[in-house]
């Protein structure tokens, strides 16, 4: 194999993934002598293609599993997808609607065929995207939440929970989505502030003597009112408790009752009670044995209980009802009112509180079990730790979970009703006399099945299955903090309840991927980025490295094309350094030829030490999920130290005549680059495999090579300190050259003065580095040098770098040039100061623009101070 002159990600990545999969590198070894490491992929919905959030999620998971595989663990990274009930059904219904067909037109069976066809199409897209990202998944174990194995687990859990009293069927107020025509759980409702109205109406007393004032934001629900309540301690209403009022329009008599729930400070202090359309009213209705009158149907239209408004949309009814009340002089006032209104997370429809018979999970005992577990040694480790408080708080305030959905796509509830007696049968299989029973048509909330994901995918409820025994509990869950309640919490309490173990050791939570300006990515804003477009432009390795290292745990990530491009430049730097190294190592040099036992130069010892320090740092940081810090450590070592310094230093022996020294340099280049590729591999799998295959190595793929370990034999602390001092000296020389505008191509005298005999000896022994990088016409290293009158000086530790300026530059011209430059920076400072002191600008300009101006000021001030210091030094 030969490395091309230029890095081309398309060429590097082509065919590589298929080879990895076909050769089975991602399959767990099953070696019983090895410790296991398992991650189950958070199953993406089959509603569409993957977005950047998925790419971030899976990149972190792949880094962890690739690293653990290299560290000798029996590693399983299990793929799978979620049927995503309401979301997928909505997509397929929309597709049918475009053809003028509804699901009811074609029936349940035919509709489900359409959904399965959709699922197959989008599952194929998702697998293609996983491949493009380079994810080390074991496809032999791929799962889908509607697979028979997972469906069996769902049925068993439902039946067991029902038998334990943890699942019950009851009539309660639930969140109803009139567009999807299904119940929703509390966390599927998004509350948004809406500019609405607060309507104040007269409810006349039945005896004809006056009225009581009632305020509401939802006038259409008054058609279902069955009482008025006031606080028993409210002096204004003590005399009317027990009286009756007439419900306008309907003319139904309503009793006035006392209930402590009423807030005397809110509105008029009197409250209408609509038990079928408000959760608080429902509780009041239960206490006072009130009738519950449902006035809407499942589409949000008024039903026959709404009288003349029957058939109207709820909001149309609201407008008409208010007009009718105005005609009867029953409207006191209408106020503007901003209030939080629940919307369906999936359809965006305004959610209707609705009295309905549904299936519920009794959450109190399950939440208690999860909270108690966090006080034991078996507790789940949240990263960052602050999210444990978020989890605990939600569990402490949890309400029962509505799990039935009025959909067709999903796990049909394993409950049957006797056709004659109405008796309920709940079982994993249908009743023996199935012809006498009818199965509940509803399906389970998607999150019910995905809550079982960590163990149902590994063979549960067959607790003797090999995968369940070996790979459960899993080691880490990596997901966004936005689904702690939807998914993470449910996996925890389901796992504890049914396996007796925590489903994972650690939960690593990342934030959201945002646009460059910090706004959330969305279709409506048109600021979304397709990860496949990024991969086609810059390669998977560039995207992966950016996603992995661009943020710290728990924080959002701002997508930046510029930053992805800078990673691409980093990979180019690695590519070029590797090409140079491989060309100089030569085809004849083999892995077994590496010999680091003798003749190591100072630079060799330094880079070997820094390699081992970086291996330790990267290993420790990865174990703590500090991927951003890993990125900095790798960049610093690879770009700043290996590429910029060691590669250049290696040219000294490689261009020399000493063959033994050349062989040592080949050994060091091979050793360092090969281990660096292994260390970088989990982050950049494609380019590291390409380079590794061209290096002397052992084994057939970097995927299954060993993670590099720290080798104490190649840790040379004194040599490292010495080399770092040499580098600082060279940097000081370069800085001084820059300040007097003297290019490296021009040889100049360089003096280094130090009183430290050991430093002098070390510099004497390593003059070749100073000569190569400083380009001196004369190099003097001494304990006793008299500094010339005209010279640039720079203190470096226990030494001083001196550049005599006599004859080197025209001092007067240089000072004049610098004074012009300082005038330029002063005028820039004046301009930006004027802008920032302008109150009109500061008050009206966007924060981003103001911050940009402040950054400019800081930059100009630094440049001004630097030039000023150079002028003063030259004048001195």
UniProtKB/Swiss-Prot annotation:
Cellular compartment(s): Cytoplasm
Keywords: Aminoacyl-tRNA synthetase, ATP-binding, Coiled coil, Cytoplasm, Ligase, Nucleotide-binding, Protein biosynthesis
Binding-site residues, ATP: 523
Keyword Transmembrane helix on entry: no
Coiled-coil intervals, chain numbering: 805-876
Domain of life: Bacteria
Catalytic reaction annotation: tRNA(Val) + L-valine + ATP = L-valyl-tRNA(Val) + AMP + diphosphate
GO MF: aminoacyl-tRNA deacylase activity; ATP binding; valine-tRNA ligase activity
Pfam families: Anticodon_1 (PF08264), tRNA-synt_1 (PF00133), Val_tRNA-synt_C (PF10458)
UniProt-listed Enzyme Commission number(s): 6.1.1.9
Gene Ontology cellular component terms for the protein in this record: cytosol
Motif position, 'HIGH' region: 44-54
GO biological process annotation, one example: valyl-tRNA aminoacylation
'KMSKS' region (motif): residue ranges: 520-524
Its biological purpose: Catalyzes the attachment of valine to tRNA(Val). As ValRS can inadvertently accommodate and process structurally similar amino acids such as threonine, to avoid such errors, it has a 'posttransfer' editing activity that hydrolyzes mischarged Thr-tRNA(Val) in a tRNA-dependent manner.
Family from the record: Belongs to the class-I aminoacyl-tRNA synthetase family. ValS type 1 subfamily.
Domain notes: ValRS has two distinct active sites: one for aminoacylation and one for editing. The misactivated threonine is translocated from the active site to the editing site.
Subunit details: Monomer.
Protein name: Valine--tRNA ligase
Organism: Staphylococcus carnosus (strain TM300)
């Amino acid at each position: 194999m030969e490395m091309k002159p230029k890095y081309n990600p398309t060429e590097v990545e082509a065919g590589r993934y298929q080879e990895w999969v076909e050769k089975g590198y991602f399959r767990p070894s099953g070696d019983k002598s090895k410790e296991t490491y398992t991650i189950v992929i958070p199953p993406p919905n089959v509603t569409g293609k993957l977005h950047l959030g998925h790419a971030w999620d899976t990149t972190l998971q792949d880094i962890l599993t690739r690293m653990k595989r290299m560290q000798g663990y029996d590693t399983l990274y299990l793929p799978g997808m979620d049927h995503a009930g309401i979301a997928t059904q909505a997509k397929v219904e929309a597709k049918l609607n475009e053809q003028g067909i509804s699901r009811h037109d074609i029936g349940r069976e035919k509709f489900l065929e359409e959904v399965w066809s959709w699922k197959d199409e989008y599952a194929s897209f998702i697998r293609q995207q996983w491949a493009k990202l380079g994810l080390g998944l074991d496809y032999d174990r791929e799962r889908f939440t509607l697979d028979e194995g997972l469906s069996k687990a769902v049925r068993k859990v439902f039946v067991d929970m029902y038998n334990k009293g943890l699942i019950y069927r009851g009539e309660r107020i639930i969140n109803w989505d009139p567009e999807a025509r299904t119940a929703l759980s509390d966390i599927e409702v998004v509350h948004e502030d809406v500019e609405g109205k607060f309507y104040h109406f007269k409810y006349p007393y039945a005896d004809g003597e006056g009225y009581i004032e009632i305020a509401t934001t939802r006038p259409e629900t008054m058609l279902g009112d069955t009482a008025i309540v006031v606080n028993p301690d409210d002096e204004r209403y003590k005399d009317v408790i027990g009286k009756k009022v007439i419900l306008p329009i309907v003319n139904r008599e309503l009793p006035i009752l006392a209930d402590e729930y009423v807030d005397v400070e809110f509105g008029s202090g009197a409250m209408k009670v609509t038990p079928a359309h408000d959760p608080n009213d429902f509780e009041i209705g239960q206490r006072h044995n009130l009738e519950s009158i449902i006035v809407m149907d499942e589409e949000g239209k008024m039903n026959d209980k709404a009288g003349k408004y029957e058939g109207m949309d709820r909001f149309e009814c609201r407008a008409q009802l208010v007009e009718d009340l105005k005609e009867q002089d029953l409207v006191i006032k209408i106020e503007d009112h901003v209030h939080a209104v629940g919307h369906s997370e999936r359809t965006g429809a305004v959610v209707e509180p609705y009295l309905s018979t549904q299936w519920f999970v009794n959450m109190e005992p399950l939440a208690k079990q999860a909270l108690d577990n966090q006080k034991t040694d078996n507790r789940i480790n949240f990263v960052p730790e602050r999210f444990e408080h978020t989890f605990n708080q939600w569990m402490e305030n949890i309400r029962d979970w509505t799990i039935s959905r009025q959909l067709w796509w999903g796990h049909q509830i394993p409950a049957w009703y006797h056709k004659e007696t109405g008796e309920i049968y709940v079982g994993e299989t249908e009743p023996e006399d199935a012809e006498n029973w009818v199965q509940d048509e509803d399906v389970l909330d998607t999150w019910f099945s995905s809550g079982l994901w960590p163990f149902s995918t590994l063979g549960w409820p067959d607790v003797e299955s090999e995968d369940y025994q070996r790979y459960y509990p899993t080691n880490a869950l990596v997901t966004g903090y936005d689904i702690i309640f939807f998914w993470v919490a449910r996996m925890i309490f389901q796992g504890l309840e049914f396996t007796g173990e925590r489903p994972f050791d650690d939960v690593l939570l990342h934030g959201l991927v945002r646009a460059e300006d910090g706004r959330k990515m969305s279709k409506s804003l048109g600021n979304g980025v397709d990860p496949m477009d990024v991969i086609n432009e810059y390669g998977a390795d560039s995207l992966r490295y950016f996603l992995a290292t661009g943020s710290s745990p728990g924080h959002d990530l701002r997508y930046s094309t510029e930053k992805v491009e800078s990673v691409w430049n980093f990979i180019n730097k690695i590519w070029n350094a590797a090409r140079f190294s491989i060309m100089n190592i030569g085809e004849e040099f083999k892995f077994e030829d590496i010999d680091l036992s003798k003749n190591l130069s100072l630079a060799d010892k330094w880079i070997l030490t820094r390699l081992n320090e970086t291996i330790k740092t990267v290993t420790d940081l990865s174990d703590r999920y500090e991927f951003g810090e890993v990125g900095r450590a790798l960049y610093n070592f690879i770009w700043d130290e290996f590429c910029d310094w060691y590669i250049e230093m290696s040219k000294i022996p490689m261009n020399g005549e000493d063959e033994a020294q050349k062989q040592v340099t080949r050994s060091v280049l091979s050793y360092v680059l090969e281990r660096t590729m292994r260390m970088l591999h989990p982050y950049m799998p494609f380019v590291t495999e390409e380079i590794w295959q061209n290096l002397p190595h052992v084994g057939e793929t970097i995927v299954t090579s060993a993670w590099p370990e720290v080798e104490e034999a190649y840790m040379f602390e004194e040599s490292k300190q010495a080399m770092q001092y040499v580098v600082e000296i060279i940097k000081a020389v370069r800085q001084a050259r820059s300040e007097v505008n003297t290019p490296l191509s021009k040889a100049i005298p360089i003096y280094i003065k130090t009183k430290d005999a050991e430093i002098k000896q070390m510099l004497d022994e390593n003059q070749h580095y100073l000569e190569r990088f400083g380009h001196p016409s004369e190099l003097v290293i001494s304990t006793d040098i008299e500094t010339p009158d005209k010279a640039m000086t720079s203190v470096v530790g226990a030494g001083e770098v001196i550049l005599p300026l006599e004859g080197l530059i025209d001092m007067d011209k240089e000072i004049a040039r610098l004074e012009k430059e300082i005038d330029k920076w002063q005028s820039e400072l004046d301009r930006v100061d004027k802008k920032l002191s302008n109150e009109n600008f500061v008050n009206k300009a966007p924060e981003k623009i103001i911050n940009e101006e402040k950054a400019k000021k800081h930059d100009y001030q630094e440049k001004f101070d630097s030039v000023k210091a150079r002028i003063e030094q030259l004048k001195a």
